[in-house]
């Protein structure tokens, strides 16, 4: 009598059996995923290097010394602090600074470097301010200030992107929001039917542009409906003579861009054409709307430009997530941050108003002030 003993397959045998049943393309994708996970694991094992004044100075002034106040290159050494940190003096504006001046954390860089690394990781995961504060062990106001300081440094570093070649153009709308303001946040949004010929106080128009060769831009242009010229004016600083714009019929139907851009070709997209599709910018538009309206539950209008730049940096970059995190950490450490904790909330809304909108907004703010006084 022959007895056949069948042993149980262990997990490795089951995995190998399942792997052998995959197609060649799926096996290659699976191996690449394993390689990526292993690289992430090795990167996490590496202990982060401790920042020193010398390291910050060498990294921030790697190319040349500059003044973080006026960006002059005429710099002289001006002694050292008691802890050994080198000081500098600008010959032009005559102000004294050190390697951490006008950065996100300033003089607290060395003390809070570990928390800053954790906070940058939270930003790359697009966590809320309260979630980030809890994870990093900081207060909610501090987490809010760090977010907007990092976004300001990111804007100073990445805002001036040039879009050459084929550029897809679209626009989106967000409700006018005073979120975070002590008084104007009481403004109740009304459900207003969209009318392109009506002066509106309800929504702001945000032109979006994505280059197929890389790069993106998105800025608040005006309240309500925007003409083609207004949309093109918002992005013209990011275009070159080689830029070829693709837009849908609604944007280009009143095309008078010759008055604004003489060297840029604007083409209307009609039907389904792979070369003239708007898939990239529409995907960008959908992601921004979901991020701002759903994930963050609305963003104050004066901060929308920064949030668009943040989203594009994370999702349109060709780098891996860990590389994006390291780059954002370096930007937070070494790039110029032109705002401080007190000035963050005093930013103005980046909106160009028509004469009718100025009158309507003035009446609205006057009424809001009267209601506040009565309360």
For each feature predicted by the language model, list its residue ranges:
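Residue-level recognition of single "structural anchor" positions
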Residues: 1-375
């Amino acid at each position: 009598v022959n007895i056949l003993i069948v042993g149980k397959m262990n997990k490795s045998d089951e995995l190998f059996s399942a792997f052998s049943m995959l197609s060649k393309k799926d096996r290659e994708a699976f191996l690449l995923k394993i390689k990526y996970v292993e690289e992430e694991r090795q990167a996490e094992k590496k202990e982060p290097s401790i920042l020193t004044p010398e390291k910050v100075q060498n990294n921030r002034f790697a190319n040349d010394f500059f003044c973080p106040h006026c960006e002059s290159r005429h710099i002289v050494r001006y002694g050292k602090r008691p802890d050994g940190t080198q000081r500098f003096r600008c010959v032009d504006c005559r102000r004294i600074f050190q390697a951490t001046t006008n950065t996100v954390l300033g003089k607290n860089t060395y003390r809070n470097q570990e928390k800053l690394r954790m906070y940058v990781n939270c930003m790359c995961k697009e966590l809320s301010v309260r979630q980030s504060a809890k994870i990093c062990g900081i207060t909610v106001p501090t987490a809010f200030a760090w977010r907007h300081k990092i976004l300001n440094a990111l804007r100073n570093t990445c805002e001036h992107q040039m879009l050459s070649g084929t550029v897809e153009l679209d626009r989106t709308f967000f409700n006018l929001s005073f979120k975070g303001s002590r008084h104007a946040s009481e403004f109740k949004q009304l459900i207003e039917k969209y009318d392109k010929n009506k002066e509106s106080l309800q929504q702001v128009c945000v032109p979006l542009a994505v280059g197929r060769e890389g790069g993106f831009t998105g800025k608040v242009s005006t309240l309500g409906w925007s003409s083609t010229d207004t949309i093109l004016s918002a992005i013209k600083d990011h275009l070159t003579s080689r830029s070829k714009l693709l837009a849908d019929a609604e944007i280009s139907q009143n095309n008078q861009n010759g008055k604004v851009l003489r060297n840029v070709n604007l083409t209307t997209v009609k039907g389904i054409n792979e070369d003239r599709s708007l898939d990239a910018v529409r995907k960008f538009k959908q992601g921004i709307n979901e991020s701002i309206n759903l994930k963050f539950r609305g963003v104050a209008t004066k901060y929308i430009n920064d949030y668009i730049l943040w989203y594009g940096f994370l999702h349109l970059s060709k780098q891996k997530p860990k590389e994006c995190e390291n780059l954002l950490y370096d930007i937070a450490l070494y790039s110029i941050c032109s705002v401080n904790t007190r000035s963050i909330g005093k930013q103005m809304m980046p909106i160009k108003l028509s004469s009718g909108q100025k009158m309507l907004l003035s009446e609205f703010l006057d009424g809001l002030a009267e209601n506040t006084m009565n309360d």
